[in-house]
Amino acid sequence: AETTAAGAGLATARGPGGSGAGAAQRTTLVDMQPDLLPPATAPAAVGLVTAAACLIKADQPMYYAACPEEGNNKKVVEENGKWYCEATQKTYDTCRRRYILRLKVQDHSGAGWVNVFHEQAREMLGVDAEDLHAIRESDPAEYERVVKRAQFKDWHLKLKAKTEEYQGESRRRLTVLQCAVPDYAAEAKHLLERIRAVWA
């Protein structure tokens, strides 16, 4: 997939499926995870963060088997070498692998776990889910190397933060809506502007 420099377009692009995650401002991971969480009924917050992917667990499920029909990303179950989709009530000879993973990211303010879905995960890992599955099946050592190579890389992320209720407890869920390779010249300019604002 083609990468986008400097996070171009991230500030105004809408979230996946036109979810309405609109204009976003630069922020930090700590600011997106306040100690006092908003209620679950509050709208999601959207922000732009430059952070490094500092931990991807190679032993975690990083993708799932999805229905091969275009536009249907529902999970399928393997049965006797075939794949059954409950959504379509059909059995298929093949399936598609789609990413769904959690990774830890860190910026200057702190760290947080984010959920990353197919398109963004493919960008960040640098390999398609089908290819990663084939590597995992044939060469577990290479699979671990591929995952490790994706760590400690900087990304300009458009994040959505939403409070969720789970078993009576509130927690903050961070989701990567978009990702791009940072433009370090633009980042340096932004930092300079912040320093000047402090001393103005």
Report residues per predicted region.
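Single-stranded nucleic acid-binding proteins centered on OB/S1-type folds
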Residues: 1-200
